[in-house]
Amino acid sequence: MYTIFFYNVILYMIFFSQFIKCNNRKIEFYNSYINLKTKGTDNIRFFVLPRIDYPTTIIINNKINFTNDISDSYDFDISDNNINNITLIWNKSLTSTETMFWNCEKIIEIDLSNFDTSSVTTMKSMFFGCSSLYSLDLSNFNTSSVTTMESMFSGCSSLYSLDLSNFDTSSVTNMGLMFFGCSSLYIL
């Protein structure tokens, strides 16, 4: 059993061989469950990936159990990590992806083709500072409820092309600095 301290909430992550596969530089969360528990009456409001200090490929599936009621909303944060490739399969109802990949400077590719964004209202700074990000598939993003995309891709200086043809921006009120620092972006 490993203990991670975060924002005065102790999360107990119980890992058995069927729950997590960790070999060299690849971490894969299978369809089994990761149980996250809180101490006392505090609610878990974040699923936070512990800091990883070496280049890693990570695959995260959506089977995560929370012991307290977090039905109102919760965030998912893997920011500021040394991960270079992510496949994220998540169909829980997220309302915010703000700073989700904040400062993941080593990340080259993110596969979000199976990522449910239908309830997301803010994507502010979602990929901010992902300076090595070269490939990003957002073709299945449902952005009909999103109101802010401010700084969403700011600092993505290696991003060459981005297909936003399926983005519904009818509810968006703030796109300020959305592509600031995207000096390699030639195809939009």
Placement of each model-derived feature along the sequence:
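Consensus positions within tandem repeat domains that build extended binding/scaffold surfaces
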Residues: 98-100, 119-128, 145-154, 173-180
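N-terminal capping/linker segments that flank leucine-rich repeat
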Residues: 10-118
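Structural signature of tandem-repeat unit edges
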Residues: 84-93, 106-119, 131-147, 158-173, ...
